[in-house]
């Protein structure tokens, strides 16, 4: 999980640099394309096959929209006015959205006072960062886009855990297929504003390559493995670690300012997220299933299949 936090936390730095060379939608398409290409090569090397069947691909495209295409585009759009460090802080709200979604779907039970307080405290921290009383203007809209991206991640994680994980497909096959689907979806958006000529910024183009291969392809596969092993809510808690990485990289590499208000908001958000992760012994779920599934694992009948359980 530490490696995933490091790779995911650096995403905001690479987006910031990539936007110096490409438009937001170009960055979105490029990272999906490079990420998909990276994982497809790994599939060839490991002899993994992509999932088959219309039903599976239907779920793949839905998950790709919520977990890849939409949040990737929102991050690129939001970071035109929001620094990489603050973007990482706002992305840390993903566990809060996952908890809200779990409550709505009935998968989160036993909302004790401390967890409810953490939920409220976390969103209070977001309000402090937004500072609507100061009239944030464009920066406020950018921050709103990033918060929406964090919420979209939560929806995507939950959908993946319910409809894709534990169906007899290797996580590498699923992550490859999902980024391939995201490439198709984001490619369709290029006529909406993603076709201006790229700027001649070598550092930005290098950042796009790193963003696509490592911060998208490898990172997304690791995310899928955690969802398979520990569930969607636990996968979302990686966001708890991202602000430290994004803030340090933003400050050291990009010399981004870090205001006292943003610092206070970050602390409030992280304390709130930490409170929501506190569980009593009775809240513990079933043991985690294996991390990966065989490429050709047989599946049981529909009545015996359980979402979130890897088919052995």
Kindly give the residue locations of the regions a language model identified:
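Hydrophobic transmembrane alpha-helices of multi-pass small-molecule transport proteins
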Residues: 39, 100-101, 111-132, 150, ...
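Transmembrane alpha-helices of multi-pass small-molecule transport proteins
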Residues: 21-70, 93-102, 152-159, 175-194, ...
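Transmembrane alpha-helical segments that form core, pore/gating elements
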Residues: 39, 98-100, 104, 135-194, ...
């Amino acid at each position: 999980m530490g490696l995933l936090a490091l790779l995911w936390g650096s995403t905001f730095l690479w987006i910031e640099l990539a936007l110096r060379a490409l438009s937001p939608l170009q960055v979105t398409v490029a990272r999906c394309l490079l990420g998909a290409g990276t994982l497809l090569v790994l599939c060839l090397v490991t002899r993994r096959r992509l999932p088959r069947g219309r039903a599976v691909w239907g779920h793949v495209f839905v998950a790709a929209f919520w977990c890849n295409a939409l949040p990737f585009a929102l991050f690129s759009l939001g970071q035109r006015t929001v620094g990489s460090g603050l973007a990482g802080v706002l992305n840390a709200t993903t566990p809060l959205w996952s908890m809200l979604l779990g409550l709505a779907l009935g998968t989160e039970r036993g909302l004790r006072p401390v967890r409810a307080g953490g939920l409220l405290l976390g969103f209070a921290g977001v309000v402090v960062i937004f500072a609507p009383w100061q009239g944030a203007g464009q920066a406020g809209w950018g921050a709103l886009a990033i918060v929406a991206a964090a919420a979209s991640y939560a929806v995507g994680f939950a959908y993946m855990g319910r409809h894709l994980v534990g169906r007899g497909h290797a996580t590498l096959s699923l992550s490859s297929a999902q980024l391939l689907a995201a490439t198709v979806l984001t490619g369709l958006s290029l006529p909406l504003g993603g076709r201006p000529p790229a700027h001649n910024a070598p550092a930005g183009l290098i950042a796009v390559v790193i963003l696509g291969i490592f911060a998208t392809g490898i990172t997304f596969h690791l995310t899928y493995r955690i969802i398979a092993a520990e569930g969607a809510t636990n996968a979302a808690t990686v966001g708890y670690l991202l602000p430290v990485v994004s803030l340090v990289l933003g400050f050291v590499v990009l010399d981004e300012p870090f205001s006292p208000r943003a610092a206070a908001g970050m602390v409030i958000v992280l304390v709130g997220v930490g409170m929501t992760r506190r569980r009593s012994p009775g809240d513990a779920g079933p043991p985690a299933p294996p991390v990966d599934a065989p490429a050709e694992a047989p599946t049981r009948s529909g009545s015996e299949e359980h979402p979130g359980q890897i088919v052995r």
